[in-house]
Amino acid sequence: MQRRIMGIETEFGVTCTFHGHRRLSPDEVARYLFRRVVSWGRSSNVFLRNGARLYLDVGSHPEYATAECDNLIQLVNHDRAGERVLEELLIDAEQRLAEEGIGGDIYLFKNNTDSAGNSYGCHENFLVARAGEFSRISDVLLPFLVTRQLICGAGKVLQTPKAATFCLSQRAEHIWEGVSSATTRSRPIINTRDEPHADAEKYRRLHVIVGDSNMSESTTMLKVGTAALVLEMIEAGVSFRDFALDNPIRAIREVSHDVTGRRPVRLAGGRQASALDIQREYHARAVEHLQNREPDPQVTQVVELWGRMLDAVETQDFAKVDTEIDWVIKRKLFQRYQDRHGFELADPKIAQLDLAYHDIKRGRGVFDVLQRKGLVKRITEDETIEAAVDTPPQTTRAKLRGEFITAAQEAGRDFTVDWVHLKLNDQAQRTVLCKDPFRSVDERVERLIASM
Protein backbone atom coordinates (compact mmCIF):
# COMPACT_ATOMS: atom_id res chain seq x y z
CA MET A 1 0.00 0.00 0.00
CA GLN A 2 1.92 3.04 -1.27
CA ARG A 3 -0.90 5.50 -0.59
CA ARG A 4 -1.79 4.90 3.04
CA ILE A 5 -4.18 6.57 5.47
CA MET A 6 -2.28 7.77 8.54
CA GLY A 7 -3.02 9.80 11.65
CA ILE A 8 -1.46 10.90 14.93
CA GLU A 9 -3.19 11.13 18.32
CA THR A 10 -1.42 13.33 20.86
CA GLU A 11 -2.19 13.64 24.56
CA PHE A 12 -0.93 16.87 26.14
CA GLY A 13 0.35 17.38 29.65
CA VAL A 14 -1.37 20.18 31.61
CA THR A 15 -0.25 22.28 34.55
CA CYS A 16 -1.11 25.71 35.91
CA THR A 17 0.86 28.16 38.06
CA PHE A 18 -1.25 30.51 40.17
CA HIS A 19 -0.57 34.07 41.22
CA GLY A 20 -1.09 33.71 44.95
CA HIS A 21 -4.75 32.75 44.65
CA ARG A 22 -6.58 29.48 45.16
CA ARG A 23 -5.12 26.55 43.31
CA LEU A 24 -7.10 24.51 40.82
CA SER A 25 -6.91 20.75 40.40
CA PRO A 26 -5.88 19.36 36.98
CA ASP A 27 -9.56 18.47 36.43
CA GLU A 28 -10.61 22.07 37.03
CA VAL A 29 -7.87 23.41 34.73
CA ALA A 30 -9.00 20.98 32.02
CA ARG A 31 -12.59 22.21 32.44
CA TYR A 32 -11.45 25.80 31.93
CA LEU A 33 -9.56 24.70 28.80
CA PHE A 34 -12.60 22.98 27.35
CA ARG A 35 -15.26 25.46 28.47
CA ARG A 36 -15.39 27.12 25.03
CA VAL A 37 -15.51 23.72 23.31
CA VAL A 38 -18.39 22.54 25.52
CA SER A 39 -20.27 25.80 24.89
CA TRP A 40 -20.54 25.14 21.15
CA GLY A 41 -20.17 21.36 21.02
CA ARG A 42 -22.18 20.50 24.18
CA SER A 43 -19.46 17.96 24.93
CA SER A 44 -15.74 17.70 25.71
CA ASN A 45 -15.49 15.21 22.82
CA VAL A 46 -15.93 16.95 19.47
CA PHE A 47 -14.94 16.81 15.81
CA LEU A 48 -13.64 20.04 14.27
CA ARG A 49 -14.05 21.72 10.91
CA ASN A 50 -10.62 20.43 9.86
CA GLY A 51 -11.81 16.84 10.35
CA ALA A 52 -9.85 16.28 13.57
CA ARG A 53 -11.14 15.00 16.90
CA LEU A 54 -10.54 16.98 20.10
CA TYR A 55 -11.42 15.52 23.48
CA LEU A 56 -10.56 15.25 27.13
CA ASP A 57 -8.89 11.90 27.75
CA VAL A 58 -8.40 9.87 30.93
CA GLY A 59 -6.55 11.83 33.61
CA SER A 60 -7.53 15.32 32.39
CA HIS A 61 -5.26 15.15 29.36
CA PRO A 62 -6.48 17.07 26.30
CA GLU A 63 -6.09 14.84 23.25
CA TYR A 64 -5.98 15.86 19.61
CA ALA A 65 -6.38 13.23 16.88
CA THR A 66 -5.51 14.48 13.41
CA ALA A 67 -7.86 13.92 10.51
CA GLU A 68 -7.05 11.12 8.08
CA CYS A 69 -3.97 12.08 6.02
CA ASP A 70 -2.46 10.31 3.02
CA ASN A 71 0.98 11.92 2.81
CA LEU A 72 3.64 12.83 5.33
CA ILE A 73 3.86 16.61 4.87
CA GLN A 74 0.07 16.82 5.11
CA LEU A 75 0.21 14.83 8.36
CA VAL A 76 2.95 17.03 9.85
CA ASN A 77 0.88 20.12 9.01
CA HIS A 78 -2.19 18.68 10.72
CA ASP A 79 -0.17 17.51 13.73
CA ARG A 80 1.22 21.04 14.14
CA ALA A 81 -2.31 22.44 13.64
CA GLY A 82 -3.28 20.49 16.76
CA GLU A 83 -0.76 22.56 18.74
CA ARG A 84 -2.40 25.75 17.44
CA VAL A 85 -5.90 24.53 18.36
CA LEU A 86 -4.76 23.72 21.91
CA GLU A 87 -2.84 27.00 22.18
CA GLU A 88 -6.07 28.89 21.38
CA LEU A 89 -7.86 27.00 24.17
CA LEU A 90 -4.99 27.84 26.55
CA ILE A 91 -5.15 31.58 25.80
CA ASP A 92 -8.94 31.59 26.16
CA ALA A 93 -8.76 29.71 29.49
CA GLU A 94 -6.15 32.12 30.89
CA GLN A 95 -8.44 35.05 30.02
CA ARG A 96 -11.33 33.36 31.84
CA LEU A 97 -9.15 32.76 34.92
CA ALA A 98 -8.17 36.44 34.92
CA GLU A 99 -11.80 37.57 34.53
CA GLU A 100 -12.81 35.41 37.51
CA GLY A 101 -10.03 36.85 39.67
CA ILE A 102 -8.14 33.56 39.95
CA GLY A 103 -5.18 34.52 37.77
CA GLY A 104 -2.66 31.99 36.54
CA ASP A 105 -0.54 30.74 33.68
CA ILE A 106 -1.63 27.51 32.00
CA TYR A 107 1.00 25.29 30.41
CA LEU A 108 0.33 22.63 27.80
CA PHE A 109 3.22 20.28 27.11
CA LYS A 110 3.60 18.11 24.03
CA ASN A 111 5.62 15.53 25.93
CA ASN A 112 5.02 12.10 27.46
CA THR A 113 5.84 12.21 31.18
CA ASP A 114 5.17 14.47 34.15
CA SER A 115 7.12 15.06 37.36
CA ALA A 116 4.95 12.53 39.22
CA GLY A 117 6.04 9.73 36.86
CA ASN A 118 2.77 9.52 34.92
CA SER A 119 2.93 8.87 31.20
CA TYR A 120 0.63 9.94 28.37
CA GLY A 121 0.96 8.99 24.77
CA CYS A 122 1.48 9.83 21.15
CA HIS A 123 -0.22 7.16 19.05
CA GLU A 124 0.35 6.56 15.35
CA ASN A 125 -2.36 5.01 13.20
CA PHE A 126 -1.81 3.24 9.90
CA LEU A 127 -4.46 1.68 7.68
CA VAL A 128 -3.50 -1.85 6.60
CA ALA A 129 -5.25 -4.40 4.42
CA ARG A 130 -7.38 -6.98 6.23
CA ALA A 131 -5.92 -9.70 3.98
CA GLY A 132 -2.53 -11.00 5.08
CA GLU A 133 -1.00 -12.11 8.33
CA PHE A 134 -1.24 -9.43 11.01
CA SER A 135 1.12 -11.50 13.16
CA ARG A 136 3.87 -11.15 10.52
CA ILE A 137 3.43 -7.39 10.54
CA SER A 138 3.83 -7.24 14.32
CA ASP A 139 6.75 -9.73 14.31
CA VAL A 140 8.77 -7.70 11.80
CA LEU A 141 7.69 -4.32 13.15
CA LEU A 142 8.47 -4.99 16.81
CA PRO A 143 12.31 -4.93 16.63
CA PHE A 144 12.08 -1.87 14.37
CA LEU A 145 9.84 0.01 16.83
CA VAL A 146 11.93 -0.96 19.88
CA THR A 147 15.04 0.53 18.22
CA ARG A 148 13.36 3.41 16.32
CA GLN A 149 13.85 5.71 19.34
CA LEU A 150 17.51 5.87 18.29
CA ILE A 151 16.51 7.97 15.27
CA CYS A 152 13.43 9.82 16.52
CA GLY A 153 13.22 9.85 20.32
CA ALA A 154 12.24 13.09 22.04
CA GLY A 155 15.02 12.78 24.64
CA LYS A 156 14.68 12.96 28.42
CA VAL A 157 16.72 13.39 31.57
CA LEU A 158 15.95 10.36 33.72
CA GLN A 159 16.59 10.71 37.45
CA THR A 160 17.75 7.41 38.93
CA PRO A 161 18.83 6.65 42.53
CA LYS A 162 22.45 6.65 41.34
CA ALA A 163 22.51 9.69 39.04
CA ALA A 164 20.75 11.57 36.29
CA THR A 165 21.15 10.10 32.81
CA PHE A 166 20.14 11.31 29.36
CA CYS A 167 17.78 8.88 27.60
CA LEU A 168 16.63 8.73 23.98
CA SER A 169 12.95 8.18 24.70
CA GLN A 170 10.36 9.58 27.11
CA ARG A 171 8.00 6.67 26.55
CA ALA A 172 10.40 3.70 26.86
CA GLU A 173 10.25 3.46 30.68
CA HIS A 174 6.44 3.23 30.56
CA ILE A 175 5.94 0.39 28.06
CA TRP A 176 5.09 -2.98 29.61
CA GLU A 177 4.11 -5.30 26.77
CA GLY A 178 5.01 -6.05 23.16
CA VAL A 179 1.63 -6.64 21.53
CA SER A 180 -1.70 -6.32 23.37
CA SER A 181 -5.29 -5.14 23.02
CA ALA A 182 -4.98 -2.84 26.07
CA THR A 183 -3.67 0.74 25.94
CA THR A 184 -3.63 2.08 29.49
CA ARG A 185 -3.31 -0.98 31.72
CA SER A 186 -0.30 -2.62 30.10
CA ARG A 187 0.87 0.00 27.55
CA PRO A 188 2.01 -2.24 24.70
CA ILE A 189 4.26 -1.26 21.78
CA ILE A 190 1.56 -2.27 19.28
CA ASN A 191 -2.12 -2.20 20.22
CA THR A 192 -4.20 -4.90 18.50
CA ARG A 193 -7.71 -3.73 19.41
CA ASP A 194 -9.57 -4.12 16.12
CA GLU A 195 -11.25 -0.77 15.41
CA PRO A 196 -10.58 -0.03 11.73
CA HIS A 197 -12.80 3.11 11.42
CA ALA A 198 -13.29 1.86 7.86
CA ASP A 199 -14.75 -1.12 5.98
CA ALA A 200 -13.84 -3.94 8.38
CA GLU A 201 -13.91 -6.54 5.62
CA LYS A 202 -11.15 -4.71 3.72
CA TYR A 203 -9.08 -2.94 6.36
CA ARG A 204 -7.76 -2.92 9.85
CA ARG A 205 -5.95 -0.16 11.73
CA LEU A 206 -2.44 -0.63 13.08
CA HIS A 207 -2.24 1.33 16.32
CA VAL A 208 1.35 2.06 17.44
CA ILE A 209 1.53 3.54 20.93
CA VAL A 210 5.24 3.34 21.70
CA GLY A 211 6.37 6.59 20.04
CA ASP A 212 7.35 9.87 21.67
CA SER A 213 5.59 13.16 21.02
CA ASN A 214 7.90 15.17 18.79
CA MET A 215 8.37 18.92 18.54
CA SER A 216 10.62 18.83 15.47
CA GLU A 217 8.73 18.55 12.18
CA SER A 218 11.61 16.56 10.67
CA THR A 219 11.53 14.07 13.56
CA THR A 220 7.76 13.62 13.24
CA MET A 221 8.14 12.99 9.51
CA LEU A 222 10.96 10.50 10.15
CA LYS A 223 9.05 8.68 12.91
CA VAL A 224 5.89 8.14 10.87
CA GLY A 225 7.62 7.88 7.50
CA THR A 226 9.98 5.07 8.50
CA ALA A 227 7.16 3.07 10.12
CA ALA A 228 4.95 3.49 7.04
CA LEU A 229 7.80 2.42 4.77
CA VAL A 230 8.60 -0.68 6.86
CA LEU A 231 4.89 -1.57 6.71
CA GLU A 232 4.92 -1.14 2.94
CA MET A 233 7.97 -3.42 2.65
CA ILE A 234 6.35 -6.11 4.81
CA GLU A 235 3.25 -5.98 2.59
CA ALA A 236 5.47 -6.21 -0.51
CA GLY A 237 7.08 -9.40 0.82
CA VAL A 238 10.53 -7.93 1.50
CA SER A 239 12.51 -10.33 3.68
CA PHE A 240 14.32 -9.07 6.77
CA ARG A 241 16.90 -10.70 9.01
CA ASP A 242 15.32 -12.27 12.07
CA PHE A 243 15.73 -9.77 14.90
CA ALA A 244 13.08 -11.28 17.19
CA LEU A 245 13.87 -9.93 20.65
CA ASP A 246 14.26 -12.17 23.67
CA ASN A 247 12.58 -9.56 25.90
CA PRO A 248 11.24 -6.49 24.04
CA ILE A 249 10.46 -4.61 27.26
CA ARG A 250 13.96 -4.97 28.68
CA ALA A 251 15.38 -4.16 25.24
CA ILE A 252 13.40 -0.93 24.84
CA ARG A 253 14.82 0.39 28.11
CA GLU A 254 18.37 -0.72 27.28
CA VAL A 255 18.19 1.04 23.91
CA SER A 256 16.81 4.22 25.49
CA HIS A 257 19.74 4.41 27.91
CA ASP A 258 22.42 4.16 25.19
CA VAL A 259 22.96 7.18 22.92
CA THR A 260 25.77 5.31 21.11
CA GLY A 261 23.33 2.71 19.74
CA ARG A 262 26.02 0.05 20.25
CA ARG A 263 24.90 -1.71 23.41
CA PRO A 264 23.96 -5.30 22.48
CA VAL A 265 20.39 -6.39 23.16
CA ARG A 266 19.54 -10.04 23.53
CA LEU A 267 17.66 -11.67 20.65
CA ALA A 268 15.59 -14.84 20.76
CA GLY A 269 17.83 -17.90 20.76
CA GLY A 270 20.65 -16.19 22.62
CA ARG A 271 22.00 -14.08 19.75
CA GLN A 272 22.80 -10.38 20.18
CA ALA A 273 22.52 -7.24 18.07
CA SER A 274 22.75 -3.53 18.77
CA ALA A 275 20.05 -0.94 18.04
CA LEU A 276 22.38 0.46 15.38
CA ASP A 277 22.73 -3.01 13.76
CA ILE A 278 18.96 -3.48 13.68
CA GLN A 279 18.21 -0.01 12.29
CA ARG A 280 20.96 -0.42 9.66
CA GLU A 281 19.26 -3.60 8.42
CA TYR A 282 15.85 -1.94 8.06
CA HIS A 283 17.42 1.10 6.40
CA ALA A 284 19.38 -1.05 3.92
CA ARG A 285 16.19 -2.87 2.91
CA ALA A 286 14.47 0.52 2.50
CA VAL A 287 17.22 1.81 0.19
CA GLU A 288 16.83 -1.33 -1.96
CA HIS A 289 13.04 -1.03 -1.91
CA LEU A 290 13.19 2.54 -3.24
CA GLN A 291 14.80 1.23 -6.43
CA ASN A 292 11.63 -0.77 -7.18
CA ARG A 293 8.86 1.64 -6.15
CA GLU A 294 7.37 4.73 -7.73
CA PRO A 295 9.51 7.78 -6.94
CA ASP A 296 8.16 9.85 -4.05
CA PRO A 297 10.17 12.88 -2.90
CA GLN A 298 8.80 12.64 0.65
CA VAL A 299 9.79 8.98 1.04
CA THR A 300 13.21 9.73 -0.48
CA GLN A 301 13.63 12.54 2.07
CA VAL A 302 12.75 10.16 4.92
CA VAL A 303 15.24 7.49 3.81
CA GLU A 304 17.98 10.10 3.34
CA LEU A 305 17.49 11.54 6.86
CA TRP A 306 17.26 8.02 8.30
CA GLY A 307 20.66 7.13 6.82
CA ARG A 308 22.20 10.44 7.86
CA MET A 309 21.00 9.96 11.43
CA LEU A 310 22.41 6.42 11.60
CA ASP A 311 25.76 7.74 10.32
CA ALA A 312 25.66 10.42 13.03
CA VAL A 313 25.01 7.81 15.74
CA GLU A 314 27.79 5.56 14.42
CA THR A 315 30.38 8.36 14.36
CA GLN A 316 28.88 10.20 17.38
CA ASP A 317 29.19 13.37 15.28
CA PHE A 318 25.72 14.90 15.26
CA ALA A 319 26.53 18.15 13.43
CA LYS A 320 24.63 17.03 10.31
CA VAL A 321 21.39 16.31 12.21
CA ASP A 322 21.45 18.71 15.16
CA THR A 323 18.69 20.90 13.71
CA GLU A 324 16.39 17.99 12.79
CA ILE A 325 16.22 15.28 15.49
CA ASP A 326 14.56 16.11 18.81
CA TRP A 327 16.83 14.20 21.18
CA VAL A 328 19.94 15.56 19.47
CA ILE A 329 18.64 19.16 19.56
CA LYS A 330 17.70 18.75 23.22
CA ARG A 331 20.99 17.15 24.32
CA LYS A 332 22.98 19.91 22.59
CA LEU A 333 20.82 22.50 24.37
CA PHE A 334 21.46 20.86 27.75
CA GLN A 335 25.20 20.57 27.13
CA ARG A 336 25.49 24.26 26.24
CA TYR A 337 23.43 25.25 29.28
CA GLN A 338 25.58 23.08 31.54
CA ASP A 339 28.81 24.49 30.09
CA ARG A 340 27.58 28.08 30.51
CA HIS A 341 26.26 27.74 34.07
CA GLY A 342 28.29 24.82 35.44
CA PHE A 343 25.21 22.72 36.18
CA GLU A 344 25.14 18.96 36.60
CA LEU A 345 22.61 17.01 34.53
CA ALA A 346 20.68 16.34 37.77
CA ASP A 347 20.17 20.07 38.43
CA PRO A 348 16.47 21.07 38.65
CA LYS A 349 17.18 23.84 36.10
CA ILE A 350 17.90 21.15 33.48
CA ALA A 351 14.62 19.38 34.33
CA GLN A 352 12.89 22.75 33.92
CA LEU A 353 14.54 23.25 30.52
CA ASP A 354 13.55 19.70 29.52
CA LEU A 355 9.91 20.53 30.24
CA ALA A 356 10.03 24.01 28.66
CA TYR A 357 11.25 22.46 25.39
CA HIS A 358 7.77 20.92 25.00
CA ASP A 359 5.73 24.03 25.96
CA ILE A 360 3.45 24.66 22.95
CA LYS A 361 2.80 28.36 23.66
CA ARG A 362 4.54 30.44 21.02
CA GLY A 363 7.01 32.98 22.36
CA ARG A 364 7.39 31.01 25.62
CA GLY A 365 8.21 27.42 24.68
CA VAL A 366 11.93 26.70 24.23
CA PHE A 367 11.47 24.75 20.99
CA ASP A 368 9.55 27.69 19.52
CA VAL A 369 12.38 30.06 20.52
CA LEU A 370 14.91 27.78 18.78
CA GLN A 371 12.68 27.64 15.71
CA ARG A 372 12.37 31.44 15.55
CA LYS A 373 16.16 31.73 15.76
CA GLY A 374 16.55 29.33 12.82
CA LEU A 375 18.21 26.68 15.01
CA VAL A 376 15.80 23.93 13.96
CA LYS A 377 14.89 22.95 10.43
CA ARG A 378 11.36 23.46 9.09
CA ILE A 379 9.63 21.21 6.55
CA THR A 380 6.32 23.11 6.67
CA GLU A 381 5.37 26.78 6.82
CA ASP A 382 3.28 28.76 9.30
CA GLU A 383 0.73 29.53 6.58
CA THR A 384 0.04 25.86 5.82
CA ILE A 385 -0.24 25.04 9.53
CA GLU A 386 -2.72 27.89 10.06
CA ALA A 387 -4.71 26.68 7.04
CA ALA A 388 -4.84 23.17 8.54
CA VAL A 389 -6.45 24.57 11.72
CA ASP A 390 -9.68 25.19 9.78
CA THR A 391 -9.34 23.15 6.58
CA PRO A 392 -9.39 19.32 6.40
CA PRO A 393 -7.04 17.30 4.16
CA GLN A 394 -8.53 17.56 0.67
CA THR A 395 -7.56 14.04 -0.46
CA THR A 396 -9.24 11.83 2.16
CA ARG A 397 -12.60 11.18 3.85
CA ALA A 398 -11.74 14.03 6.25
CA LYS A 399 -12.79 16.49 3.53
CA LEU A 400 -16.36 15.11 3.64
CA ARG A 401 -16.49 15.30 7.44
CA GLY A 402 -15.07 18.82 7.54
CA GLU A 403 -17.46 20.12 4.88
CA PHE A 404 -20.44 18.50 6.63
CA ILE A 405 -19.52 19.99 10.02
CA THR A 406 -18.94 23.45 8.52
CA ALA A 407 -22.25 23.39 6.62
CA ALA A 408 -24.23 22.12 9.64
CA GLN A 409 -22.75 24.72 11.99
CA GLU A 410 -23.35 27.57 9.54
CA ALA A 411 -26.95 26.41 8.99
CA GLY A 412 -27.50 26.09 12.75
CA ARG A 413 -28.37 22.41 12.42
CA ASP A 414 -27.98 19.80 15.14
CA PHE A 415 -25.67 16.99 14.01
CA THR A 416 -23.60 14.03 15.17
CA VAL A 417 -20.37 12.80 13.59
CA ASP A 418 -17.68 10.22 14.25
CA TRP A 419 -14.92 8.79 12.04
CA VAL A 420 -17.38 6.98 9.74
CA HIS A 421 -20.86 8.49 10.34
CA LEU A 422 -22.32 11.86 9.36
CA LYS A 423 -25.78 12.36 10.85
CA LEU A 424 -28.34 15.17 10.86
CA ASN A 425 -30.34 15.04 14.08
CA ASP A 426 -33.64 16.01 12.47
CA GLN A 427 -36.91 14.11 12.32
CA ALA A 428 -35.61 11.86 9.54
CA GLN A 429 -32.30 11.17 11.37
CA ARG A 430 -30.55 11.07 8.00
CA THR A 431 -27.15 9.37 8.21
CA VAL A 432 -24.37 8.77 5.69
CA LEU A 433 -21.92 5.96 6.39
CA CYS A 434 -18.45 6.77 4.98
CA LYS A 435 -16.53 3.48 5.13
CA ASP A 436 -13.85 4.35 2.55
CA PRO A 437 -11.22 6.64 4.14
CA PHE A 438 -9.58 7.24 0.73
CA ARG A 439 -12.75 8.78 -0.71
CA SER A 440 -12.93 12.59 -0.64
CA VAL A 441 -15.97 13.01 -2.95
CA ASP A 442 -19.37 11.45 -2.19
CA GLU A 443 -22.70 12.42 -3.79
CA ARG A 444 -24.60 11.22 -0.71
CA VAL A 445 -22.77 13.74 1.47
CA GLU A 446 -23.29 16.48 -1.11
CA ARG A 447 -27.05 15.78 -1.07
CA LEU A 448 -27.12 15.79 2.74
CA ILE A 449 -25.35 19.17 2.81
CA ALA A 450 -27.61 20.57 0.08
CA SER A 451 -30.69 19.61 2.12
CA MET A 452 -29.75 21.78 5.11
UniProtKB/Swiss-Prot annotation:
The record's active-site residues are: 57
UniProt name for this protein: Pup--protein ligase 1
Give the enzyme's main class according to its UniProt record, as a single word.
ligase
PANTHER family in the record, alphabetically? PUP DEAMIDASE/DEPUPYLASE (PTHR42307), PUP--PROTEIN LIGASE (PTHR42307:SF3)
- Which EC numbers characterise this protein's activity in its record? 6.3.1.19
Record keywords, A-Z: ATP-binding, Ligase, Magnesium, Metal-binding, Nucleotide-binding, Ubl conjugation pathway
Kindly list the biological process annotations in GO that this record carries: modification-dependent protein catabolic process; proteasomal protein catabolic process; protein pupylation
The job of this chain, per UniProt, is described as:
Catalyzes the covalent attachment of the prokaryotic ubiquitin-like protein modifier Pup to the proteasomal substrate proteins, thereby targeting them for proteasomal degradation. This tagging system is termed pupylation. The ligation reaction involves the side-chain carboxylate of the C-terminal glutamate of Pup and the side-chain amino group of a substrate lysine.
Q: Which residues bind ATP?
A: 53, 66, 419
Q: Which residues bind Mg(2+)?
A: 9, 55, 63
State the pathway, as annotated in the record: Protein degradation; proteasomal Pup-dependent pathway; Protein modification; protein pupylation
Write down the Pfam families for this protein, in alphabetical order: Pup_ligase
- Molecular-function annotations in GO: ATP binding; ligase activity, forming carbon-nitrogen bonds; magnesium ion binding; ubiquitin-like protein transferase activity
Annotated S-S bridges: none
Species of the source: Rhodococcus erythropolis (Arthrobacter picolinophilus)
Something else the entry says is: The reaction mechanism probably proceeds via the activation of Pup by phosphorylation of its C-terminal glutamate, which is then subject to nucleophilic attack by the substrate lysine, resulting in an isopeptide bond and the release of phosphate as a good leaving group.
Which family, according to UniProt?
Belongs to the Pup ligase/Pup deamidase family. Pup-conjugating enzyme subfamily.
Q: Which reaction does it catalyse?
A: ATP + [prokaryotic ubiquitin-like protein]-L-glutamate + [protein]-L-lysine = ADP + phosphate + N(6)-([prokaryotic ubiquitin-like protein]-gamma-L-glutamyl)-[protein]-L-lysine
